[in-house]
Design a protein with these regions (language model features):
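Iron-sulfur cluster-binding electron-transfer modules in prokaryotic oxidoreductases
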Residues: 91-452
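Cysteine-centered iron-sulfur cluster-binding motifs in ferredoxin-type domains/subunits
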Residues: 21-42, 63-87, 91, 100, ...
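A structural signal for alpha-helical segments
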Residues: 17-20, 59-62, 88, 298, ...
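Generic signal for short, ordered secondary-structure residues
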Residues: 8, 17-18, 50, 60, ...
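Asp/Glu-centered strand-loop micro-motifs enriched in Gly/Pro and often flanked by an aromatic residue
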Residues: 9-30, 59
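Non-heme iron-sulfur electron-transfer modules
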Residues: 1-12, 37-70, 84-115, 437-443
Length: 452
C-alpha cells in the first residue's frame, strides 16, 4: 500500500495499490464520521458500510465507484479532517478520490463521447474565443436551457441542457484593458495608476475565463477599485484557463501543460513582488494549492505565494496603512453610500467551497464589516465546484446539493447577494432567481468607482 498523491509515482495509478489505500481511508472515515453531512460521497459511503455491518472490505465495486464519482473536489472534508498531514495517518480524502478516478480512467477508459465531452469542457479558451467573436449567434443558443440545440450540444459537451449558463460578452476583458484602459491611463496620467515601487501596490491580473469571456464588467470594476486604492495594474500576456477542468476530469498532463504556461506568464511579476489578483475562488485555489504540488518548481511556488483574491488583497492594504486606506474607503453610513445613493448596506454573502478551502479566512466578510455593511453569511454548497455540477450525469445530484443553499438565501430575503465564485453565483440565480454579484462590484457601486 502506498500513500502517494504524486502522479509520477509508479504506484499512483496501480489498481491494487489504490484499492488497498481506499480500504484504509474508508475504514478511518467510517470510525470518525465528522464529515457525514458534507457531501453525497460521505452519505453514500457511510450508508453502504452500515449495510455491510461496518465491513469496508465488503463494499461492492459499484458502491466504491459511486463514492468516487460523487466527490466533486470541494475540499471541505480536508479542512475538517483531524487526520490530514502532519498526522501520521496522512489522510487526504479528495486527493485519494482524484487518484482513484484517474486510476479507473486509465485501466477502464471511458467511452468516446465521455472523452470528447471532457475535452470540449476543458478547452475553455478555445470555446471562449469563438463564442465572444460570434456572441450574437452563440448566446441565444447557450441561454436557451432545455432547448433542442442545447440537448444536442449536451451529447458533445457533456454540459446539462437544463443548466442555466452565462452568456458570452461581445468584447473580451483583455481587449478592453489593452486597447481602452491602458490608453486612457496614459492619457490621463492618474496618479493612482502610475507605476509604483511598492510591491503591495503592484498587481498582476489573472482575469479567469469567466471575466475574460463572459463578464468583463467584473474585471472593469476590479481594475477601478484596485486603482482607486492606489494599485498599479498590469495584465501579463500568455495567461489562459487555470486548468481546473483538466485536473478535475483526471487529465493530469494537460493540466500540467496549462499550469506551466500560466506560471511562465506570471513568473516575472510574482518574482518582482507583485500580487497576482485572481477574481474567482476555484482558480485561486488551484493556483495556490495545486500548482506547487503538481508542478514541483520554485517558479510554481513563487506564483502560488503571490496569489490573492481581490478582497483579501484590499484588506491586506488596510493592514499595511490603515489611515490611507480609510481615507480612500471611508466607512459607509446606514442612510446611504459614499456618493449619497440609497443603500441599506445589508447583504448576503455566499461563502463558496473553494473560498473556504484556501484557508485564508473570509476576507470579503471582514472587509464588508470594516466598511459598515451588515453581512449575513450563507455557508452552503452551490453544487457546482468547478465543472462537476455542469455535467449532465451530475445534474440531478448537483441540484439536490444546492437546495440547502437555496433555502438559506430564500429565508434571508436579501436585497443584495454576492459571492466570490462566478459559477456558484449562476447557481444562485438558477435556484433563487436572484442575481448574485462579485463582492468587488458591491464596493465599486457603493463608492461610485468606475474604470474607464
Amino acid at each position: 500500500m502506498s500513500i502517494t498523491y504524486n502522479p509520477d509515482d509508479p504506484l499512483y495509478a496501480d489498481a491494487d495499490d489504490v484499492s488497498r489505500e481506499i480500504d484504509r481511508v474508508f475504514d478511518i472515515c467510517h470510525g470518525c464520521r465528522v464529515c457525514f453531512s458534507l457531501c453525497p460521497s460521505f452519505t453514500d459511503l457511510f450508508n453502504s458500510i452500515d449495510a455491510h455491518d461496518g465491513r469496508v472490505s465488503e463494499l461492492t465495486p459499484e458502491e466504491r465507484d459511486g463514492v468516487i464519482s460523487e466527490c466533486y473536489q470541494c475540499k471541505l472534508c480536508a479542512l475538517r479532517c483531524p487526520y490530514v498531514p502532519p498526522h501520521e495517518w496522512l489522510l487526504d480524502f479528495p486527493k485519494l478520490m482524484l487518484r482513484a478516478a484517474i486510476q479507473k480512467k486509465n485501466s477502464d477508459p471511458p467511452p468516446f463521447h465521455v472523452r470528447l465531452a471532457d475535452s470540449v469542457m476543458s478547452r475553455t479558451d478555445l470555446s471562449g474565443r469563438f463564442a465572444t467573436a460570434f456572441s450574437g449567434l452563440v448566446n441565444p443558443v447557450v441561454t436557451s436551457k432545455g432547448g433542442l440545440i442545447r440537448k444536442a450540444m449536451e451529447s458533445v459537451s457533456g454540459i446539462a441542457s437544463q443548466r442555466l449558463l452565462p452568456p458570452y460578452a461581445k468584447r473580451r476583458f483583455s481587449t478592453w484593458f489593452k486597447r481602452d484602459h491602458v490608453a486612457n491611463r496614459t492619457a490621463t496620467g492618474n496618479p493612482g495608476r502610475e507605476k509604483t515601487d511598492n510591491p503591495m501596490r503592484s498587481v498582476a491580473l489573472f482575469p479567469t475565463c469567466f471575466v475574460e469571456y463572459m463578464d468583463p464588467e467584473i474585471g472593469k470594476d476590479l481594475v477601478g477599485v484596485l486603482e482607486h486604492a492606489g494599485a498599479s495594474c498590469t495584465l501579463p500576456s500568455g495567461t489562459q484557463c487555470c486548468g481546473a477542468p483538466w485536473l478535475h476530469s483526471g487529465h493530469i498532463e494537460q493540466f500540467r501543460q496549462t499550469a506551466a504556461k500560466n506560471i511562465e506568464a506570471l513568473r516575472e511579476s510574482a518574482t518582482n513582488g507583485a500580487q497576482v489578483i485572481v477574481p474567482q475562488a476555484t482558480c485561486a485555489y488551484v493556483m495556490r494549492k495545486d500548482y506547487p504540488e503538481l508542478i514541483d518548481s520554485s517558479d510554481a511556488r513563487v506564483v502560488a505565494d503571490a496569489v490573492r483574491e481581490p478582497m483579501e488583497y484590499l484588506i491586506g492594504l488596510r493592514k499595511g496603512n490603515r489611515d490611507l486606506f480609510d481615507s480612500l474607503f471611508p466607512p459607509l453610513q446606514k442612510e446611504g453610500s459614499a456618493d449619497g445613493a440609497d443603500n441599506d448596506l445589508s447583504i448576503v454573502y455566499h461563502v463558496s467551497c473553494h473560498t473556504q478551502a484556501q484557508g485564508v479566512g473570509l476576507k470579503a466578510r471582514d472587509l464588508f464589516g470594516v466598511l459598515g455593511f451588515s453581512v449575513k453569511l450563507v455557508n452552503k454548497c452551490a453544487g457546482i465546484d468547478g465543472t462537476w455540477g455542469y455535467k449532465s450525469k451530475n445534474y440531478a445530484l448537483a441540484k439536490k446539493v444546492a437546495q440547502p443553499m437555496k433555502r438559506a438565501i430564500d429565508d434571508a430575503a436579501p436585497r443584495e447577494v454576492c459571492g466570490d465564485c462566478h459559477l456558484a453565483n449562476y447557481a444562485i440565480l438558477e435556484e433563487t432567481g436572484l442575481r448574485s454579484v462579485h463582492p468587488i462590484q458591491i464596493l465599486a457601486r457603493a463608492y461610485g468607482i468606475r474604470s474607464d
